[in-house]
Amino acid sequence: RFRDRIAAAIRARLEVADQELVRRGTTLFSLPMHAADGAKAIWGTADRIWTALGDTSQDLNWYTKRATLSAVYGSTVLYWLGDNSPGHQATWEFLDRRIEQVMQFEKLKGSLRENPLGKALMAGPGKVLERIRAPKLPDDLPGRPFG
C-alpha cells in the first residue's frame, strides 16, 4: 500500500537523524528570523520523499501532496523529539494515525467529487484550480532526468 511506503520513508528519514541535532535545529527554526528556512527544510523533505516514491503529478496535486506530507512529517518530528518509548514505537503509532487521518480526508474529498451538489459547488473553483501547475525545474542540473 502506498501509505505504508510513505510511513516507511518518514520512518527511515527519522531513523538516520541525530535526535539531539534535530532538537537543536527545531529550536533554531522556531525563531521568527529562521522560521522560513525551517518551513523550506520541511517542504524540501516532503518533496524529496514524494520524488523518491515516483510522484509524477503536475497539477494542484503536486502542491497538496507536499503540503499534507509536510504537516504529517512536521508533527511526527515534534512527537519523535519527546518520545522515550522503546524503539520510538509511540512515534510510529502516531505516524500511522496521522496517515490514517489524511486517508479519511481524501475519502471525504472523493465523496464530495462524486456528489452532485459537491460537483456543482466546485465547478467554479475547479476551473481556476485546474490551471495550477507544478514548478518547472531546469533539466540541466546534476541529478535531474533529461527530457
What is each PLM-predicted segment?
Residues 1-23:
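Hydrophobic alpha-helical connector segments
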Residues 7, 29, 37-39:
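Amphipathic alpha-helical interaction segments
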Residues 12, 16, 48, 52, ...:
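Solvent-exposed, charged/polar functional surfaces in cytosolic regulatory/catalytic domains
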Residues 25-32:
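Short linear capping/connector segments at secondary-structure termini
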Residues 33-55, 63-70, 74:
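Amphipathic alpha-helical packing segments from all-alpha helical-bundle domains
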Residues 55-120:
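Hydrophobic/aromatic-rich alpha-helical bundle segments in the mid-to-C-terminal region
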Residues 108-147:
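Long, charge-rich low-complexity segments
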